Every structure is written in C-alpha cells, then in structure tokens.
Regions:
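Short, conserved catalytic or interaction motifs in soluble domains
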Residues: 21
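C-terminal cap/substrate-recognition subdomain and adjoining C-terminal extension
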Residues: 24-35, 44-48, 139-292
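Alpha-helical substrate-recognition element adjacent to the catalytic core
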Residues: 27-177, 185, 191, 291-292
Length: 292
C-alpha cells in the first residue's frame, strides 16, 4: 500500500553500526544463452507446498514472501488489504469512497491485531533455511506496526541478504522518472510503497551486489498481479522463477452489500472517535489534507 512519508522513530531505528560478514555462497550458475529459463506459477492454498519445495533446493534459492493475506490477515474488513482493493476500484460509488484512505489504513495498522493466514504459517516460514525476505507493498511509515504483528504472531526476522545489520532507506525512481518511492530494507522486511515487486527485487539485489548469488527465486504472494510482475521481471533478467499464488484467503469482488455496510459503519465510528478525541486530526482528514 502506497505511502511516502516516514516516521522519525523508524529513521532513528536504522542507525545501527554493527555488521557481520555475509556468508560465502558460490555464484549462481547463469543459464546459457539459448537455454530455456524455468518460469513456473502454481496456485496453492496451503503453505506446506512451500516447505516441500524448500526441502528440494539448496542455499542458492531465494525465497520471497508477501505479508498481507499471505502470511498475516486482518481480523476485520475495514482497513484490511481486501478493503483497500475495494476502495481503489474505479467504479466505486462516491458515497462509499473514503477520503485519505491511507491515513485510515495507518490508524488501523496501529490499532488492529492480525492473525496468521493458517495456523502453521509462522512455523513453515521460520523453517525455510534458505535466504529469504519479506517483500511488501506497504510503505515504510507502516513499518512499526508491520514488525509488531509479524513478531507477535511468531514470525522470525531473517538476516539481511548481504549479512549487514544496518538498515537501509533510500529514494528510488524509474528510469523514465514516471514513478518514484522511498524504499527501506531492515530486519529482512523490504517495504516498496506499492511499486512493481519484480522490479523492486532486482533493484534490491543490484543495490546489495547480489544479482549473481541465486540460481532461482521463489515468490509466495496472494496477489496475482504481483506473481505476474515478478515473472515478467525475472524472465527479462533470465532468472529462473517459481511463483506460488496463495489463494487461501477469499476476497470476492464486488464486495457483498453486508460487508460494504459494515465497512461504512466502522468508518463512521472511526470518524466519530477522531472528532471527539483528536479533533485536529479529524479536521485535517475531513478537509482532504492527507498525511500519507
């Protein structure tokens, strides 16, 4: 979910000085010029498929995991990933559109608890011994709440791919300057602010000088667009790819009327709370002066 502003606490948290040496791993074996590069996408509704794949592959395999509705899922509709997809629909009636939706998402992230998409998902993730990272479309200003819920639900934070203990935060823009975001990579969580995940992963590997380290990339993600974007980017880079499209969390569109009504009621309650307790912020949001 896209955002562009940063929490001062996060910036302070990145100022770490300790470093450890990156493990020595043989360089990846590049496909020959005429070789067919594997590119396989499989629908799954159980994370055990990922652990089965991991058991058959070595340390030159990079595992990439989405967070929302892949590892964690919201316990309510309002402010969830499902709600966000509904809110950004072009045909959504004006009366159902929420002003400053990213602000309300931020408020929800801070207030809500999340749960694993399946009971054994944390154990399956933690058992993957190969290099891995969380790759999320969330922006960096959601980092504190994101890390809190991952930790609370039992997910371990992977070591940085290059072995560094330092966090990184930097500005990125596309070659044609049509897209730009602030990105961050810290505690194994790569936050990309809504950008193309395939482009972002290759960008991170280049930035860490690790493009030649891996023989293959595995992405586990509930978003078909993310699965396809990764496939396209890695095919162009001639990197073998295995995508696991995680379909366990059902998010039918259009949203049924009962769920839409529930979201509208929750939104009104949130607005009433802000108006009573934090009137200054309420007025900012009502005026469309979005902070995120």
């Amino acid at each position: 979910m896209k955002s562009i502003k940063w929490l001062p606490a996060f910036v302070a948290g990145l100022m770490l000085t300790a470093c450890v040496s990156a493990p020595l791993i043989p360089a990846a074996t590049a496909p020959t010029a005429n070789a067919t590069v594997p590119s396989v996408v499989t629908d799954i509704d159980d994370m055990t498929a990922v652990s089965d794949f991991a058991a058959q592959h070595d340390q030159r395999t990079l595992f990439v995991f989405d967070i929302d509705d892949t590892l964690l899922t919201a316990e309510q509709f309002f402010g969830s990933d499902y709600w966000y997809e509904w809110q950004k629909a072009k045909d959504l009636p004006n009366e159902q559109q929420v002003k400053c939706k990213f602000d309300y998402i931020a408020l929800n992230y801070e207030a809500q608890t999340m749960k694993p998409t399946q009971a054994d998902a944390p154990a399956i993730f933690n058992a993957v011994s190969q290099p891995k990272l969380f790759l999320t479309s969330r922006g960096g200003n959601y980092r504190g709440a994101t890390e809190r819920e991952l930790h609370r639900n039992g997910y371990s934070f992977p070591s940085a791919l290059d072995g560094s203990a330092e966090g990184r935060i930097w500005d990125w823009q596309s070659a044609d300057d049509s897209r730009h975001s602030t990105l961050s990579y810290f505690r194994g969580v790569f936050m990309t602010s809504g950008q193309d995940k395939g482009v972002m992963l290759l960008h991170l590997l280049d930035r860490l000088q690790l493009r030649d380290r891996f023989d293959r990339v595995v992405l586990v993600d509930d978003g078909k667009a993310n699965i396809d974007n990764m496939r396209n980017a890695l095919a162009a880079a001639r990197v073998p790819y295995y995508g696991f499209h995680y379909v366990r969390i059902d998010k039918p569109q259009p949203v049924n009327p009962e769920l839409a009504e529930q979201a509208e009621n929750d939104y009104e309650q949130s607005r009433s709370y802000l108006k009573e307790v934090f009137p200054g912020r309420y007025e900012e949001l009502q005026a469309g002066r979005c902070a995120y």
